[in-house]
């Protein structure tokens, strides 16, 4: 008798599980995530992918492309979503690829992302440097010369990144092009050189953003300091105001990151659209994960493990997102 009860219970569980799986909104639908070539974006992308899998979707490995290509792929429907839309940094690319007519963007995935220019604290204190405009002085600029040409060397952005245009625009607006060189290339490799210079006690001058591992390695306020700018200046926005409530101006507004999806796809998939709108990830959690990657735990398997760990530590929140998304399908 006991065996038959156990069998009946197991059979009922199997049937309900199969029925539930068949009822999931994503059954039979494949999702193609897209991100940039920055591997530190994989963590947040995979977190969204995991939640989509719980809705029944088959989610492919993220494609890694330049941001411009990513937005074009999303607009055409070749890609389904990206978890790394920066506002306002990517606004020009977003609009150029079709804007709100082509894209679905609701909610805020990550709040409080910062970016700007930093120098080592030792040099800042010694020469009383607080503002990037001080580098108009050739004597000050020369402190950050790494190749002997007399100009300050700024560790800057990869070609094609949103920050590239902003930096070039600001160097021109602040009349720094004669005394500052914007060095571009592989950002991670350039920053590794910059950090080596710092460890040798040499002055450093670089652009960075959070969330990213750099500020775990060179801590603002302790090792390095943010430089202010003389006035707000962003490309394509004459009315840009990057001044903070306390009057400080670091040249960039505090950014937000969003999940952006192909609009037509999102309209046909209300559960996924709801998920994209409600997921939220603290910037500190991304910084912490990026730091672990920088310490050597950066393989595909490692990052999957970081996602597992985050979900386990926030299971109730994660399940809440999934359940709320499922309710939107009904």
UniProtKB/Swiss-Prot annotation:
In which broad location class does this protein mainly occur, judging by the first location in its UniProt entry?
periplasm
Summarize where substrate binds, as residue positions: 86, 90, 161-163
GO biological-process terms attached to the record: amino acid import across plasma membrane; cellular response to osmotic stress; glycine betaine transport; glycine import across plasma membrane; hyperosmotic response
InterPro entries registered for this protein in UniProt = ABC_Gly_betaine_transp_sub-bd
Q: Which residues form the signal peptide?
A: 1-21
This protein's record includes keyword Transport:
yes
> Can you list the GO cellular component terms from the UniProt entry?
membrane; outer membrane-bounded periplasmic space; ProVWX complex
List cystine links. 157-163
Instruction: Say if the entry is tagged with keyword Disulfide bond.
Output: yes
Record localization: Periplasm
Induction of this protein: by what? By cold shock in a PNPase-dependent fashion.
Keywords of the record, alphabetical order, are: Amino-acid transport, Disulfide bond, Periplasm, Signal, Transport
Protein origin, superkingdom = Bacteria
The molecular function terms in GO held by this entry are: quaternary ammonium group binding; transmembrane transporter activity
**Subunit arrangement?**
The complex is composed of two ATP-binding proteins (ProV), two transmembrane proteins (ProW) and a solute-binding protein (ProX).
Job description of the protein: Part of the ProU ABC transporter complex involved in glycine betaine and proline betaine uptake. Binds glycine betaine and proline betaine with high affinity.
Identification of the protein by name: Glycine betaine/proline betaine-binding periplasmic protein
Taxonomy of origin reads:
Bacteria, Pseudomonadati, Pseudomonadota, Gammaproteobacteria, Enterobacterales
């Amino acid at each position: 008798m006991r065996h038959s009860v156990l069998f009946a219970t197991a059979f009922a569980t199997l049937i309900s599980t199969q029925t539930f799986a068949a009822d999931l909104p994503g059954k039979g639908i494949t999702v193609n995530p897209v991100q940039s070539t920055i591997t530190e974006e994989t963590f947040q992308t995979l977190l969204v992918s995991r939640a989509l899998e719980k809705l029944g979707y088959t989610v492919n490995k993220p494609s890694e492309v330049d941001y411009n290509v990513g937005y074009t792929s999303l607009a055409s429907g070749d890609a389904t979503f990206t978890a790394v839309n920066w506002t306002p940094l990517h606004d020009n690319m977003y609009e150029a690829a079709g804007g709100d007519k082509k894209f679905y963007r609701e909610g805020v995935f990550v709040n409080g992302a910062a970016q700007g220019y930093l120098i080592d604290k030792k040099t800042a204190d010694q020469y009383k440097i607080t503002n990037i405009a001080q580098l108009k002085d050739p004597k000050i600029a020369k402190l950050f010369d790494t190749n002997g040409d007399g100009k300050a060397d700024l560790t800057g952005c990869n070609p094609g990144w949103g920050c590239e245009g902003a930096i070039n625009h600001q160097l021109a607006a602040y009349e720094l092009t004669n005394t500052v060189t914007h060095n571009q290339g592989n950002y991670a490799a350039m920053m590794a050189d910059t950090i080596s210079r710092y460890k040798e006690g040499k002055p450093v001058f670089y652009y960075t953003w959070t969330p990213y591992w750099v500020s775990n390695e060179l801590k603002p306020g302790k090792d390095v300091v943010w430089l202010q700018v003389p006035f707000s200046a962003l490309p394509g926005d004459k009315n840009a105001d990057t001044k903070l409530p306390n009057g400080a101006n670091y040249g960039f507004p505090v950014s937000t990151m969003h999940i952006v999806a192909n609009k037509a796809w999102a309209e046909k998939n209300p559960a996924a659209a709801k998920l994209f709108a409600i997921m939220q990830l603290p910037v500190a959690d991304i910084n912490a994960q990026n730091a672990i990657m920088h310490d050597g735990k950066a393989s595909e398997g490692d990052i999957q493990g970081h996602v597992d760990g985050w979900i386990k530590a926030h299971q109730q929140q994660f399940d809440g997102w999934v359940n709320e998304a499922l309710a939107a399908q009904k």
